[in-house]
């Protein structure tokens, strides 16, 4: 018998042994119980991702809170990452794009949010590059103007003016804009609103 025929015979015997073991439920080729656990974790992970995009850390934390086994969670996270259903770079880029445009958030506030979601520093920095400083200033100005429009009376004295100014500056501060820029834009927006009320 030549070498190739010998290899074929060994493979045939190994396949026969595997089929007999599998028929008796003794095969370790496919761990049915483990795959069942993975399917449950994967199902829950996909439900969470269907609600909204999430970072790797955020999804992992949520799955751990549901008391799934950590090694199964890690395998599912790995599968989702390899299939590009879970990607911190895409998540961070979309998070910044949407929150800057729709919520009027500063780059500093967005950086803090991404950090809380477990996105690493390099990925956060790359995502935040899409925010232009001029655009950020325009966003801050729009927030200041919107908040200043809520003033319905002309301040009667300096104390009233300062109170109104604090409200506008507070709106900017909550969105993470720098104090100096916030004060300038708040004063500009409040003064313009007072002029509108006078006319």
Swiss-Prot record:
GO cellular component: cytoplasm
InterPro entries: RecX_HTH_1st (IPR053926), RecX_HTH_2nd (IPR053924), Regulatory_RecX (IPR003783), WH-like_DNA-bd_sf (IPR036388)
One of the Pfam families matching this protein, by short name: RecX_HTH1
Domain of life, source organism: Bacteria
Biological process, per Gene Ontology: regulation of DNA repair
Subcellular location field: Cytoplasm
Keyword Cytoplasm in annotation: yes
Organism: Corynebacterium glutamicum (strain ATCC 13032 / DSM 20300 / JCM 1318 / BCRC 11384 / CCUG 27702 / LMG 3730 / NBRC 12168 / NCIMB 10025 / NRRL B-2784 / 534)
Keyword Cytoplasm tagged: yes
Name by which UniProt lists this protein: Regulatory protein RecX
Gene3D superfamilies: Winged helix-like DNA-binding domain superfamily/Winged helix DNA-binding domain
Keywords: Cytoplasm
Role, per record: Modulates RecA activity.
Primary site of residence: cytoplasm
Family classification: Belongs to the RecX family.
């Amino acid at each position: 018998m030549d070498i190739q025929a010998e290899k074929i015979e060994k493979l045939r015997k190994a396949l026969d042994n595997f089929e007999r073991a599998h028929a008796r439920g003794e095969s370790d080729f496919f761990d049915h119980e483990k795959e069942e656990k993975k399917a449950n974790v994967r199902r829950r992970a996909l439900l969470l991702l269907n609600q909204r995009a999430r970072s790797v850390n955020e999804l992992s934390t949520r799955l751990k809170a549901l008391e799934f086994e950590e090694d199964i969670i890690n395998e599912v996270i790995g599968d989702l990452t390899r299939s590009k259903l879970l990607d911190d770079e895409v998540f961070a880029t979309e998070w910044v794009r949407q929150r800057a445009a729709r919520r009027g958030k500063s780059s500093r506030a967005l950086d803090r949010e991404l950090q809380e979601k477990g996105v690493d520093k390099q990925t956060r920095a790359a995502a935040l590059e899409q925010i232009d400083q001029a655009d950020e200033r325009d966003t801050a100005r729009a927030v200041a103007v919107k908040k200043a429009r809520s003033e319905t009376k002309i301040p009667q004295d300096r104390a009233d003016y300062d109170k109104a100014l604090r409200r506008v500056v507070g709106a900017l501060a909550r969105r993470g804009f720098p104090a100096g820029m916030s004060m300038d834009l708040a004063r500009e927006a409040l003064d313009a609103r007072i002029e509108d009320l006078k006319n």
